Amino acid sequence: MGYNQIDCFKIHLTILRVLGVWPEENPSICYIYFSRIFVFIFTVLYVIIYTMNFYFLPQQLEIFAEELIFYFTNVGALSKALAFIFLRDKVKKMLDMLESEMFQTDNLEEVKLIEKAKEKSLFYWKITFGLSVSANTVNVFLPFVLHLIFSIKLEFPVCRYSFIPEQYEAIFLYPAYLYQSIGITSHMLYNVNIDTFLLGVMFLAMAQLDILDRKLRKVTDVCVNVDAPRGSIDKMIDDQNAVLEINKCIKHYDAVCEYCKLIQEAFSEILFVLFSSGSCKICMCLFRFTMPAETQYFVFLTLYIVVMTLQVMVPCWFGSRLIEKSSQITFAVYDCDWTPRCRRFKSNLRLLVERANRPIIIKGGKMFLLSLATFTAIMNSSYSFFALLRNVQTR
């Protein structure tokens, strides 16, 4: 017992603690003030200024399209940061549940399933973190270095800040650039760590379903007196042991359902904003492709639209895998030697089957089911919006 499952989230929570959205159990007064100030200045105020800037933009469609692409990304990061702050108790309850007695095991095969889920979680974090940091470095820090060395004109990495008068642009260039750089970097870290945290808790949920599947297929292995006659003491002992095992499986299944319910409650708003903004971002990227631009900008757009598509597709993919694994529970139940067991065992077995007939699902905003069907619908809506914009543009 005591197998630690949540240590794969140590790096996620450490970075989120630095960013002010995941305090320790008893945070100091300094950290509380730091957290509120940092989140307000570089997340809330950042999006407010970005929104206000649309009023001052030149009346050019391609400029609006460019600004909207990053705007939806920043709104998504804001929703993730605020959700982690206000729904922190649910996230903590979820982590406590992973460390509860119900989800612990000493079986070597079951430990390997959990270890595999943890390794997968860290693998996705490393890939996402590496790509995001590289892209952020090219977008934010490389232009500044080139500006210092070769005196190339420095442009803001995210938002134009068109509300700054021309006579004051030189004065506010470096402070505004620094502010945008810190803001977009923190948003990148919010996105990376919260997105991969969601994938990690889903991987562990699927690992628990795999463990439950394995237990159900072997639930009658506790019966050692297979040839004992009906009504004998040995037969009664075997039936009693089998009933105890199936009851443990029912409790385990209930715990997995409760755990997935906590995932939905903690990430419902995040998923809703992710899917809504994802559709808008893909639409605006497609729309921007129809306008003239430099080659390097088209390369950037291509990479960006691929990343945004994956950001929506990956959780949908594993949401479908979660549904499939929970649906397989009903087949695992009948793979055990249940026919010679007592009536009470069969009654409990039927109860578990009735519960498992409704697969475990996760929804975003009580609207978007986390599945590949939802991903297809999002892509279809993105193209529909794009076609509508093209129709308006050509008139």
Tell me the role of every PLM-derived stretch:
Residues M1-L68, S100-M202, R217-K235, E269, ...:
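Helix-loop-helix junctions within predominantly alpha-helical proteins
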Residues K80-L98, L199, M206, V312-C336:
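Inner-leaflet juxtamembrane helices
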Residues A81-F86, K215-V226, K235-V243, A266, ...:
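Short intracellular "coupling" helices and adjacent cytoplasmic loop segments at the cytosolic face
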Residues F84, L198, A205, K235, ...:
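Amphipathic alpha-helical coiled-coil segments and their boundaries
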Residues K93-F103, I211-R214, K218, K248-L262, ...:
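Short amphipathic alpha-helical coupling elements at transmembrane boundaries
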Residues K215, E294, F298, I305-R395:
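C-terminal transmembrane module of eukaryotic multi-pass membrane proteins
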Residues P229-I270, L274-S277, L352:
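Intracellular effector-coupling site of seven-transmembrane GPCRs
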Residues L274-E294, M379-F386:
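A hydrophobic transmembrane-helix motif
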